[in-house]
């Protein structure tokens, strides 16, 4: 197992694209700090160092928990190659057989990305390097230089037969480079047949080069912070509002997100309903904020669970995560009431939503149908989907949440089960 790995973060002060960008504040901390924190939080490295030409950058590095290495004068110019400063760092820190190069211009490459990439490197030892890549939005076959007269003479592709989706191409995004030290010092690069790709999404791959990139990063980080703070507060406010319901028991218990929480239902087939839905919550949060804290005193004869649509929008979400939290939740239900009959409702399709993809929803439903053995899986597709596989627009007011027609359909399906 390749365990002795050092993280090298290069931070030169004299950037041409955006002056002093590594020290610029991205909302609440310097750009450089995002990469330092991600490296430390990953716990994949024995040491994290910043190689820099700037005492100021060195001070920033130390304040966020990293060591720093001041480059010699000949490596402090924009003419110095990455190979040269990496070689210099490795000549100082000689005890490491492998290293990761983490460029600070990729602030949205987080600890999870690092963990996954390092584990890929550790488990597939026939490869000497792992490089993060992202899908290219322009195929290389249509990228050409202009001639001296700014004409398109080099664009000689037969565009009548061109299909932009015919070839899927990737390019290094600059976020993560991992290599065996000896291999890198010999080849002087990270690429080739002994290198493996670690694929990242477009947003996480943002590489800051100029002012426009930095302004985009500010917008993205503001969105992340706002969503995290507002949603967290709203979820906990709603949990506090439902304390009485958590202390009550009815024959039908509803557990889930807003599709339950927004449903004004008191009885189904004249059977009392205890609606414990929490708007905005996902399966992990419901387990950690409610189930694990044992806020629910007991469960009814029939328990219906609605999760998944808020899971799939979580960064770095995996189907296995949803399955695990569902299983833990159902184990708690059975612990409280061994006689409870548990039903897992399928994730409803959406209509025209940019934040959710029906292909991902269908894939999750198929996975849950095949792997859930701790509850009865109930598919709602036959009543919710239109002929195109979308949520029928007659059942929704925003493409995601149900209107009264949608809730009538849902009530009818549950009524058939509990009759």
From Swiss-Prot:
EC numbers on record: 2.7.7.43
CDD domains: CMP-NeuAc_Synthase (cd02513), NnaC_like (cd01841)
Keyword set includes Magnesium: yes
Ways its activity is controlled: Inhibited by the CTP analogs 5-mercuri-CTP and CTP-2',3'-dialdehyde.
Principal location class: cytoplasm
Keywords: Capsule biogenesis/degradation, Cytoplasm, Magnesium, Manganese, Nucleotidyltransferase, Transferase
Kinase found in the keyword field: no
Gene Ontology terms: cellular component: cytoplasm
Location of the protein in the cell: Cytoplasm
Gene Ontology MF terms: hydrolase activity, acting on ester bonds; N-acylneuraminate cytidylyltransferase activity
Required co-factors: Mg(2+); Mn(2+)
Organism domain of life: Bacteria
Catalysed conversion reaction: an N-acylneuraminate + CTP = a CMP-N-acyl-beta-neuraminate + diphosphate
InterPro entries named in the record: CMP-NeuNAc_synthase, Cytidylyl_trans, Nucleotide-diphossugar_trans, SGNH_hydro, SGNH_hydro_sf
Annotated PANTHER family: HAD SUPERFAMILY MEMBERS CMAS AND KDSC, N-ACYLNEURAMINATE CYTIDYLYLTRANSFERASE-RELATED
Entry function: Catalyzes the formation of CMP-N-acetylneuraminic acid (CMP-NeuNAc), which is essential for the formation of the capsule.
Family: Belongs to the CMP-NeuNAc synthase family.
SUBUNIT field: Monomer. May form aggregates.
Protein name from the UniProt record: N-acylneuraminate cytidylyltransferase
Organism: Escherichia coli O18:K1:H7 (strain RS218 / NMEC)
Gene: neuA
